[in-house]
């Protein structure tokens, strides 16, 4: 698929409707994605209203594409539907645990990626928001998510109003391990990251953030130990609140 080879995140959208017909078609096609036990352990909350998008925005650090996109999808790990079905059919469900969350989260993220591929093949632009798992309680409250439903991904969707350049990727050899895992030597790390570190765009990131290396942009500025630990606590609390962790 050329759309995969050429994909970029789209954060600016044209003032053009994404019809219910098109959206539902893409969502239905995405349901053919792999799923554990054919249970489809996911659900999707569609937000179109300005009010709804403004309510979600703070959970995503008020990134402008949340309110600027015609459609925002919140994809949830959902064991509630399966649990209620089982209870109503004389089953004894036991899905209030971390393994069940992982199974449902995997289903939800597979669905998210399949939908993204389909949407972009249809000409739409998307942006995956990793912020969904940073402050999940805000999303849970805003979307009124019940027990055994946990937000794991968000997509903003619309017709592109920008065409950004492709971002760099590590070389294929950096991710492939034949037969067994081969740990990373310093020489391999240097090799894998040489091209990324040599790019002028990334050199500029280092300069404007007033650090010595590109790695420090990520560890000291963007994804700090302090923030990761604090948000981990919040995520675990949300899992407990939603019934996946005791």
Give the residues covered by each predicted segment.
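Acidic, surface-exposed loops and disordered segments
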Residues: 1-246
């Amino acid at each position: 698929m050329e759309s995969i080879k050429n994909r970029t995140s789209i954060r600016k959208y044209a003032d053009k409707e994404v019809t219910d017909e098109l959206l539902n078609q893409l969502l239905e096609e995405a349901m053919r994605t792999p799923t554990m036990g054919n249970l489809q352990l996911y659900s999707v909350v569609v937000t179109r209203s300005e009010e709804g998008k403004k309510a979600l925005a703070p959970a995503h650090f008020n990134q402008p594409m949340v309110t600027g996109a015609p459609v925002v999808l919140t994809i949830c790990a959902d064991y509630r539907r399966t649990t209620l079905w089982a209870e109503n059919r004389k089953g004894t469900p036991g899905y209030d645990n971390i393994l069940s969350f992982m199974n449902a989260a995997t289903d939800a993220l597979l669905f998210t990626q399949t939908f993204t591929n389909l949407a972009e093949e249809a000409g739409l632009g998307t942006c995956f928001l990793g912020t969904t798992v940073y402050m999940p309680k805000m999303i849970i409250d805003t979307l009124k998510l019940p027990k055994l439903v946990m937000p794991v991904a968000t997509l903003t969707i619309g017709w592109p109003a920008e065409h950004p350049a492709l971002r760099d990727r590590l070389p294929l050899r950096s991710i492939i391990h034949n037969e067994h895992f081969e740990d990373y030597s310093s020489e391999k790390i240097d090799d894998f990251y040489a091209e990324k570190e040599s790019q002028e765009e990334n050199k500029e990131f280092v300069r404007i953030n007033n650090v010595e290396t590109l790695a420090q942009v990520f560890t000291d500025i963007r994804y700090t130990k302090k923030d990761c630990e604090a948000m981990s606590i919040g995520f675990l609390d949300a899992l407990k609140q939603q019934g996946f962790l005791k």
